[in-house]
UniProtKB/Swiss-Prot annotation:
EC assignment: 3.4.14.12
EC supergroup of this enzyme: hydrolase
Organism: Porphyromonas gingivalis (strain ATCC BAA-308 / W83)
InterPro entries linked: AB_hydrolase_fold, Peptidase_S9_cat, Peptidase_S9B_N, Serine_Prot_S9B/DPPIV
Lineage of the organism: Bacteria, Pseudomonadati, Bacteroidota, Bacteroidia, Bacteroidales
Biological role: Serine proteinase. Releases tripeptides from the free amino terminus of proteins. Has a requirement for Pro in the P1 position, but is inactivated by Pro in the P1' position.
Protein name: Prolyl tripeptidyl peptidase
Result of altering residue 636 to A: Reduced activity
Length: 732
């Protein structure tokens, strides 16, 4: 087959690709070998080989709480030591009214803190929720729940909970002890399958994780209302009953009508509900809701259907009327607001906004007239988590990639601007929780050689180590893990990779290699975490004599807007070119058997796997594609149109990425795997690809998990990866 001009240019660039100096974790070749039950989440022994962690660790004011054995532990963060108070399940049982005692177990009930100042937690028990005041040592109220109760959202005070049942929204007030449960208030009564309240909307894109939003004092509840009646339903079939049952999934596909979302505000004092007057067009995205501290204004980041414009609008909470547009952000590719406004402590008119307007996600200080006061953080790195403020409200705390795209560190900076200060300088990945008053942090740290270390730090006063996890791999054979960089297909962008070498590696021998790929937005597979972010299956395959290689190609996360947006309107092209540069690097290694290269990925990685098998069948002998996007016309609007635009606007891009049209190009062994009730990449994708292959007289293999959605989770995940392993060992 003749090579196109693009392929010739691509091969020329990759021929120049060299790996920059790499680092390696030394192998431990003696010891036992792992099983999948030990390496895979859901496996019977997985948690025996998972780094130790502190269960339920979270802040309560300047105290932190967690579960240890059968006890709830309550610690005062005061520098280099900890003042500890313990409550056992037995202690709590003694405080409970008759008939509400905890079951006798070795594990303490799960919980969450509610009100930072009052020591209030909610304990999740069978049949209900228990409000417990740790400082007063008493049970304060009870909430009755059942399996139909969903989307629980507690008020800031903690005495009320909003929830969804049968598509309607309710608010319940906890009953006092001895008085039974109070009756719930129905905020809405007309909910149906096509009209839903209080749930996450817009396919959970734009950072949307829930559908209810309490005002700061708990006086009002804002909520989403989603009308799906204009969306053609996709059937999701449950095959377990004697007669299979079909349930509709209202899944708006690219280029088709989208659902209509509005925002309501329920006022508890009057029982009145008003809806924001967001106007026309109705097909837009209402994202990142946030309240003003005085509860008078609700702010909404409104994104147009084309997703190239974001307006931050203010609405009157009493009437729902539009007040003003604070500012507008546009981008020639796409905008993607992910975070609501965060007001400065004690201020009703100044807030922090996160934006990629300069090419990197940074923090900006605004006032409520829409005036930009200043850009607070700046540089060719990404703020990955805005944590909050110091007690005086003069400094910001955040996590970022300033040290390296592979790391996260916790920084502070003066709100007036200036140099950032790294408060967690140890090289690796720091996941932090700032205390509500901004005086202390919980730092959960990992590095390639540190399984997990948990430290509580009073900022400027000292630290207390809560946990230093032991190496869970002790006594087991571990392969060498190499990390480094290669050059992208553009010849100028470094890409990070990880390479798990075969166990008992002999440089004089030849070994097969499996490329594990994702390649799409919002994912980063190579980081400086435990085992250099190498997963359990990589180690399992190394035991069987395979190398496993992963490179984060352009389009993946945390490298800035230009790095990600290069894929816009042409998904699968730039990412594939970069992945092939990774293959070129592998082929340059004397120990790689170039005739035995495989590829595996899931979701976007399933799309990439199938694409690579169809495009480079002369390179990849075997592929396993899980939950693959096959035709982007059949993917949902919010994600698909952001990166592709609408099919009517970019028919060439959709056509180039439509793998149905290339089913006849399949040469190697390809197995597709799909969950039969997948609501993310609907089953239709891989089924239609099979149909196209039948017509083209090509012969993929296929495996279905009837009881699983987009990912195969729980104990069946071990079965999944045994299936994948067998496919590679049989054919590669």
């Amino acid at each position: 087959m003749k090579k196109t001009i693009f392929q010739q240019l691509f091969l020329s660039v990759c021929a120049l690709t060299v790996a920059l100096p790499c680092s390696a974790q030394s192998p431990e070749t003696s010891g036992k070998e792992f099983t999948l039950e030990q390496l895979m989440p859901g496996g019977k022994e997985f948690y025996n080989f998972y780094p130790e962690y502190v269960v339920g660790l979270q802040w309560m004011g300047d105290n932190y709480v967690f579960i240890e054995g059968d006890d709830l532990v309550f610690n005062k963060a005061n520098g280099k030591s900890a003042q500890t108070t313990r409550f056992s399940a037995a202690d709590l049982n003694a405080l409970m009214p008759e008939g509400c005692k905890f079951q006798t177990t070795d594990a303490f009930p799960s919980f969450r803190t509610l009100d930072a100042g009052r020591g209030l937690v909610v304990l999740f028990t069978q049949g209900g929720l228990v409000g417990f005041d740790m400082l007063a040592r008493k049970v304060t109220y009870l909430f009755d729940t059942n399996e139909e109760t969903a989307s629980l959202d507690f008020s800031p005070v903690g005495d009320r909970v909003a929830y969804v049942r049968n598509h309607n929204l309710y608010i319940a007030r906890g009953g006092k002890l001895g008085e039974g449960m109070s009756r719930a208030i129905a905020v809405t009564i007309d909910g149906t399958e096509t009209l839903v309240y209080g749930q996450a909307v817009h396919q959970r894109e734009f950072g949307i994780e829930k559908g209810t939003f309490w005002s700061p004092k708990g006086s009002c509840l804002a909520f989403y209302r989603m009308d799906q009646s204009m969306v053609k339903p996709t059937p999701i079939v449950d095959y377990h009953p004697l007669e299979a049952e079909s349930k509709p999934l209202y899944y708006p596909m690219a280029g088709t009508p989208s659902h209509h979302v509005t925002v309501g505000i329920y006022h508890l004092a009057t029982g009145k509900t008003v809806y924001l007057q967001t106007g026309e067009p109705k097909e837009k995205f209402l994202t990142n809701l946030s309240w003003s501290p005085d509860e008078n204004i609700l702010y909404v980041a409104e994104v147009n259907r084309a997703q190239n414009e974001c307006k931050v609008n203010a609405y009157d909470a009493e009437t729902g009327r539009f007040v003003r547009t604070l500012f507008v952000e546009t981008d020639k590719h796409y905008v993607e607001p992910l975070h609501p406004l965060t007001f400065l402590p004690g201020s009703n008119n100044q807030f922090i906004w996160q934006s990629r307007r300069d090419g990197w996600n940074h923090l900006y200080l605004y006032d409520t007239t829409g005036r930009l006061i200043r850009q607070v953080t700046k540089g060719e790195w990404e703020v990955t988590n805005f944590a909050g403020f110091d007690p005086k409200g003069t400094r910001l705390y955040f996590e970022s990639t300033e040290a390296s795209p592979l790391e996260r560190h916790f920084y502070c900076i003066d709100i007036k601007g200036g140099k950032t200060k790294d408060l967690t300088p140890e090289s690796g990945m720091h996941r932090t929780q700032l205390s509500p008053d901004g005086s202390a942090i919980i730092d959960i740290f990992q590095s390639p050689t540190v399984p997990r270390k948990v430290t509580v730090t009073n900022i400027g006063k000292g630290s207390h180590t809560l946990l230093e996890a032991k190496n869970p791999d002790t006594g087991y054979a571990m392969p060498e893990i190499r990390t480094g960089t290669i050059m992208a297909a553009d010849g100028q962008t470094p890409l990070y990779y990880k390479l798990t070498m075969p166990l008992h590696f002999d440089p004089a021998k030849k070994y097969p290699v499996i490329v594990y790929v994702y390649g799409g937005p919002h994912a980063q597979l190579v980081t400086k975490t435990w085992r250099s972010s190498v997963g359990g299956w990589d180690i399992y395959m190394a035991q069987k004599g395979y190398a496993v290689f992963t490179v984060d190609s352009r389009g993946s996360a945390n490298r800035g807007a230009a790095f990600e947006q290069v894929i816009h309107r042409r998904l699968g092209q730039t990412e594939m070119a970069d992945q092939m540069c990774g293959v070129d690097f592998l082929k340059s290694q004397s120990w790689v058997d170039a005739d035995r290269i495989g590829v595996h990925g899931w979701s976007y990685g399933g799309f990439m796997t199938t694409n690579l098998m169809l495009t480079h069948g002369d390179v990849f002998k075997v592929g396993v594609a899980g939950g693959p996007v096959i035709d982007w016309n059949r993917y949902e609007i919010m994600y698909g149109e952001r990166y592709f635009d609408a099919p009517q606007e970019n028919p060439e891009g959709y056509d180039a990425a439509n793998l149905l049209k290339r089913a006849g190009d399949l040469k190697g062994r390809l197995m597709l795997i799909h969950g039969a009730i997948d609501p993310v990449v609907v089953w239709q994708h891989s089924l239609l690809f099979l149909d196209a292959c039948v017509k083209a007289r090509t012969y993929p293999d296929y495996y279905v998990y009837p009881s699983h959605e987009h990912n195969v989770m729980g104990p069946d995940r071990v079965h999944l990866y045994e299936t994948i392993t067998r496919y590679f060992t049989d054919h590669l």
